């Protein structure tokens, strides 16, 4: 069974990671929610779930090549089997927050925690640390630093920083190579085939296509640009191979959002038309 991978929070904060378009299932989890769950995309019913402890903040989850499940939680990152067995657990230091856990194209895993210093690690399937990058975000509160770190084709790390509204490129040695300012509090960065990046701009209620080399915004999708949906906190963007896109649309900073049909997860096609959505506060918070 192939699985699309997403994240929800207790208020259905949605973020997403590696996917295969042939899938009819979604892997969902998230900050404040008491579980990670596999949901049938067609019926929107939970078909598998793994309990999470109260207070865990799960902002990344992924299906690994061998069908295990990788996820971050505030105190660390875990790899578990579908039978709920723990393969390994890597803890974040006291006072730090593990916010990133993703599968890299080479099959290894990328983990990152906020703190002093902030740290990015690459580990293998056994949980053995292959590399470690420490760097200073110059942001006082760890919780205001970042959520999802990514790696570019050049082998450097792209870090979207909440408090300073910027995307930083960090080398494996921890050197700051480049910084580009964006709107809002960026949550995630996703590469496109044309070399540009999609940036989820959080509370700016928008996402952009960014030429990172020049700093130019190629296009911007605003709060009311998608018919049938309204963007709130844009948490993560997942480009599809067919030109479509999944948009994770957290309602948490708007008390009125949950009262109407404002999809928490939106799928649009290459023309920007909404073709599927998920809006289920009753089940997921």
Task: Annotate each PLM feature.
Residues 1-4, 8-23:
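Bacterial Sec-dependent signal peptides at the C-terminal "C-region" and cleavage site
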């Amino acid at each position: 069974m192939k699985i699309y991978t997403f994240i929800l929070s207790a208020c259905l904060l949605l973020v997403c990671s590696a996917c295969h378009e042939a899938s009819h299932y979604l892997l969902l989890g998230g900050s404040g929610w008491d579980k990670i769950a596999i949901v049938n995309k067609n019926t929107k019913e939970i078909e598998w779930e793994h309990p999470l402890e109260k207070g865990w903040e799960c902002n990344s989850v992924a299906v690994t090549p061998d069908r295990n499940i990788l996820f971050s939680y505030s105190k660390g990152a875990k790899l578990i089997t579908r039978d709920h067995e723990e393969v390994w657990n890597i803890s974040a230091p006291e006072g730090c927050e593990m916010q990133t856990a993703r599968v890299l194209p080479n099959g290894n895993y990328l983990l990152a925690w906020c703190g002093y210093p902030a740290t990015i690690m690459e580990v293998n399937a056994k949980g053995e640390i292959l590399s470690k990058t420490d760097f200073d975000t110059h942001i006082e509160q760890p919780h205001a630093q970042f959520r999802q770190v990514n790696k570019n084709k050049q082998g450097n790390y792209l870090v979207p920083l909440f408090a300073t509204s910027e995307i930083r490129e960090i080398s494996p040695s921890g050197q700051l190579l480049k910084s580009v300012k964006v709107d809002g509090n960026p949550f995630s960065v996703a590469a496109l085939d044309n070399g540009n990046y999609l940036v989820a701009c959080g509370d700016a209620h928008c996402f952009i296509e960014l030429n990172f080399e020049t700093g130019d915004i190629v296009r911007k999708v605003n709060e009311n640009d998608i018919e049938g949906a309204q963007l709130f906190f844009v948490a993560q963007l997942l480009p599809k191979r067919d030109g479509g896109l999944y948009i994770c649309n957290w309602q948490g900073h708007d008390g009125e959002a949950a009262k109407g049909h404002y999809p928490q997860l939106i799928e649009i096609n290459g023309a920007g038309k909404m073709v599927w959505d998920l809006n289920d506060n009753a089940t997921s918070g």
